Every structure is written in structure tokens, then in C-alpha cells.
A protein has these predicted regions:
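A local structural motif
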Residues: 31-34, 58-70, 85-87, 158-170, ...
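Secondary-structure end/capping motifs
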Residues: 229-307
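Conserved C-terminal helix/tail region of periplasmic/extracytoplasmic solute-binding proteins
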Residues: 298-328
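Extracytoplasmic "Venus flytrap"
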Residues: 32-51, 72-74, 143-145
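Flexible hinge/capping segments at coil-to-helix
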Residues: 28-30, 124-139, 230-233
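Pocket-lining segment of extracytoplasmic ligand-binding domains
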Residues: 94-95, 168-169, 173-262
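Short, low-complexity disordered leader/linker segments with a strong preference
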Residues: 1-34, 324-328
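Pocket-flanking alpha-helical
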Residues: 46-49, 69-108, 117-130, 150, ...
Length: 328
């Protein structure tokens, strides 16, 4: 009997030891997680949360670190996602379509903007170009695969201009801006805050934008699919912090403007102009948005900028944002 008791006691001790090891391993695995967040040059609640340190504050509770990477436009986000160097980001409509067609594993987890005026085609104040028709034979700077890229080609198609009749120069914003200012290019297809910056400060003219063309450029929060499957609770936490920043911006607009002007080295008037063009949201990706995205994807396929047809609803998962917003 005593011998049997000793065996049982030993077995129980081993079980408790193994359970403790398993718990310790799981805990250390969580502590080893680093959330990699991408950010662009736009004025987004993502930037506010970064400057406030809210992501670090929230993820620290889980023993999780945060790493930030800045990108010039949407397409480079997906190169980083493909190589596991990015877990979250905020991008426009065209980059997600290109990435889906390329087979990159990402998920649209929320819709954050439904902008129309925030993307357009700029020309210099003294330019003789007054409409899209005048772009024939001209040099136009644009970031390949961006929302502005989509808008440019939609504008050309609407006016019956063959893409071969314009000289499209593919430049990221940090390259396109000096090229535009120096006159090396005749026009620049771009988004805010660059549009507001150049129209207010430099007298540039917008010859067309999403509102005039009836072309929206929605933005999305995205997550690396594998990361989202492995850490759904962190996806929800990410969305809660974004929502916190969005709500805070609405309630503390003057202070938010100061943060944006300081971070981007631009005037308060430019920030206000950007906000007049678009206000941030955090909502599920609706059926209407998916349908608009499908039209854009079909157009991109017809144009030849993506090599295969896609179904845009396949990359949408609203479950995270529905939980995050509901839990407010």
C-alpha cells in the first residue's frame, strides 16, 4: 500500500512539474512576441496612438513588444508581410488588390476611411494643364500600385486617353515630391496630406479627384493572416487601441492637430484641410465596399496591372473589429 502511494505521489509530482513547464513555456512564448506595425505619412489615428505610446502601453500588459516601420506607400507593406516583417498596417484600396492577386497572405480587418477628395491629380499653379485631357504626352508621377495609381488610370479611361499616350513615371512620394516641385514632371497623382500641402502652401491645382470621378479610395487596417490566426486576442487589442485614438482625436481635435503638425512638420491649416476631406472611421468592411473593391480589381485586371482575376471578399474578416467595437 505504502509502495503504491509512493508511486502515485511520484506520478502526481511529475505531472505538476510538466504542467508548470508547459505553463512557463507558453508564458515565455507570449513574452517573445513582437508586434510589428507599419505606418505611412498620412494623418491617421495610428500616428496619434504611436506618439501617445498607447500601443506599447497596451501590449506591455501581455508582455508583448512593439516595433514600428515607416513606409512611403501601400505596396511596400506587402513585401514586408510576405517576409514576416510586418503584422499590422493601414493601406489604401489598390495595394490590397495587388497583394491579393500576388498571393500574399493578409487579411482586411477593418475599414478606416471612405475618402473621395483625399486622392487626386496635382499640377503646378502656372501649368497650362487644366483638365485630364491635357495630360496627353505629359509626364505624370505616381507610386505604382497605390490608390493614386488606380485613380490616375480611371481618370485617363474616363477621358478616353490611352495609357500609352502619357508618360507615367513610377515614383514613391519622397521621390515624386522634389520631381514635381522642380518641374521634372508635369503632374502628380497623389493623396493627402500632399494634396493639401501643395494646394494651400504652393498654389498647386487639383485637376481631378475621387469626388469628381466618383471613385472612392477606401483605406483598410490589415493583418498578416498567420499572425492573426496565432494571436487573435492581439488583433482585437490592436483595433481597440486604434479606436481609442480615433475617439480621442474627435474629442480633442486642437491637441490632435498639434501632434500632427509637430510630427509631420506641416501647418495646422493643412491638417484641418485634410480633416475636411476625410474623417477617420473604424467599421467592418461592408458589402458596398467589397463591391467597389471588386470593380477596382476587375479594372486593374483589364488594365493588366494584376495578372489574375480575384474575388475581393476572400480577404475580409470582420470578426475582429466586430468584437473590438462591441467591447468598447
Amino acid at each position: 500500500m505504502y509502495k503504491k502511494f509512493k508511486v502515485l505521489s511520484f506520478a502526481l509530482a511529475i505531472s505538476l512539474f510538466l504542467f508548470g513547464c508547459e505553463k512557463s513555456t507558453a508564458s515565455s512564448k507570449k513574452e517573445d512576441v513582437t508586434v510589428q506595425i507599419g505606418i505611412q505619412q498620412g494623418l491617421s489615428p495610428l500616428l496619434l496612438a504611436q506618439k501617445k505610446g498607447w500601443f506599447e502601453e497596451e501590449f506591455k500588459k501581455e508582455g508583448v513588444k512593439v516595433k514600428w516601420t515607416e513606409f512611403q506607400s501601400g505596396p511596400p507593406y506587402f513585401e514586408a508581410i510576405a517576409s514576416n516583417r510586418l503584422d499590422f498596417g493601414e493601406v489604401g484600396n489598390s495595394p490590397v488588390i495587388s497583394a491579393q492577386a500576388a498571393g500574399i497572405e493578409f487579411t482586411e480587418i477593418a475599414n478606416t476611411s471612405y475618402a473621395r477628395k483625399g486622392t487626386g491629380i496635382l499640377v503646378q499653379k502656372d501649368s497650362k494643364i487644366t483638365s485630364v485631357k491635357d495630360l496627353k504626352g505629359k509626364k505624370i508621377a505616381v507610386a505604382k500600385g497605390s490608390s493614386a495609381f488606380n485613380l490616375l488610370y480611371r481618370a485617363l479611361e474616363k477621358e478616353g486617353i490611352n495609357a500609352k499616350d502619357v508618360n507615367v513615371i513610377q515614383l514613391q512620394p519622397d521621390e515624386a515630391q522634389p520631381a514635381f516641385e522642380s518641374g521634372s514632371v508635369d503632374a502628380w497623382a497623389i493623396w493627402d496630406p500632399f494634396i493639401s500641402l501643395h494646394t494651400l502652401n504652393k498654389g498647386a491645382k487639383v485637376i481631378t479627384d475621387g469626388e469628381q470621378l466618383n471613385v472612392s479610395s477606401p483605406e483598410f487596417l490589415i493583418a498578416r493572416t498567420k499572425f492573426a490566426k496565432e494571436h487573435p486576442e492581439l488583433v482585437e487589442k490592436f483595433l481597440k487601441v486604434y479606436e481609442k485614438a480615433r475617439v480621442w482625436q474627435g474629442s480633442n481635435l486642437d491637441e490632435a492637430i498639434k501632434i500632427y503638425t509637430s510630427a509631420k512638420k506641416i501647418d495646422a491649416e493643412i491638417v484641418k484641410e485634410v480633416f475636411d476631406h476625410d474623417k477617420p472611421i473604424l467599421v467592418p468592411v461592408t458589402k458596398e465596399i467589397i463591391e467597389e473593391q471588386q470593380k477596382t480589381a476587375d479594372f486593374q485586371y483589364k488594365l493588366g496591372s494584376i495578372k489574375k482575376e480575384i474575388k475581393t471578399d476572400k480577404v475580409v474578416d470582420n470578426s475582429f473589429v466586430e468584437k473590438a467595437v462591441k467591447a468598447k
